[in-house]
Amino acid sequence: MATVRKGQWSGHLSREAFGERFRANFLDPAFEAEQASIARLEQVAWNAYRHGRKAPRTRGAGPGFDDPEYALSVEWSETRLRLLKAEAKQKNPGTRSRVLVICCAARNDGTCPGEMSKTFRLASLVRETLGKEEEVDIDLLDLSELASGYGRKIHPCKGCVSTAMPLCHWPCSCYPNHALGQTNDWMAEIYERWVAAHGIVLCTPVYWYQMPSPLKLMCDRLVCADGGNPDPTSTSGKDPEKAKALEQRGWGYPKHLQGRVYGLVVHGDVAGIEGTRRALSDWLDWMGLIDSGAASRLDRYIGYYEPYATSHEALDADAALHEEVRNVARAVANAVELLRAGNLSRPDVVLRSPRPK
């Protein structure tokens, strides 16, 4: 039996330190008239923190779970039901095809940068091209809302999978955590949008030789789609010993998003595009998604070693890049059509990995 290792966590905050962090949300002088009310709310929040009220609203799991009496988070249960509904629709051959286009840049004109991103323009080209397909619905997910939208958050992955795969639940049950104030987690909605799609197109810039933080946050939180446990009651929530025992007895590592097709548009200005494109394609391949052909995996420089200030003008002038981006969209549309008709070639689909993980 594997041993659960302890000793890293520094422990709970003091009452004073907790209060400082809580009150930091109310530094605007406009809140001064409500200091007494804020103090009462602080005490409620402190009690929730001290007593670990992660999921204050629960209900019995019910039939179909390993422990039907286990008190599951109502919020998690509702997310799960939405995913099951989206999956049923996605697998129904009578429904319209759906492609999720994701703008992965952090920049937009609604906050500090003051200008839209080139990535958004490229994602819009993808959306425009897909829009010409009669049987395709397009869903545009703009991750820059993390930087400009009130309360938008993708909390970081806590790494449960490294303790044991069954401790990582599908969908993620780490959030919301009301005791720690870790709420408004966007991933509950994002999981549903991935599940609903037949095709995915990621459009991303390169930040410091790699993907932007909004995209990395989403990638990490999608680990539960690759081997995640759909039954939190089997591990009594977050019991690491039970999860380790369950994995050691044999775990199937279910790929909850496998079989969808994908395309990539990666752009940069001086370096890093090939490594970023490779990292993303390897990640999607690992999760069981299918690339839409060589033309669907694009990496290009825009305004190579030119000033940042004129990079939009450089994009304006690169007509060939515009057409290459359109070809990514066309390749994905073609792949979705072939996939849903059962005609997409997948020579390795019957193979089983000798090293499942």
Where does each model-flagged region fall?
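Glycine-rich phosphate/pyrophosphate-binding loop and the adjoining helix
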Residues: A2-R98, F120, A271-E274, R278-K357
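Helix-loop-strand module that forms the ligand-binding subsite of alpha/beta enzymes
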Residues: T3-G52, E75-A88, S173-M287
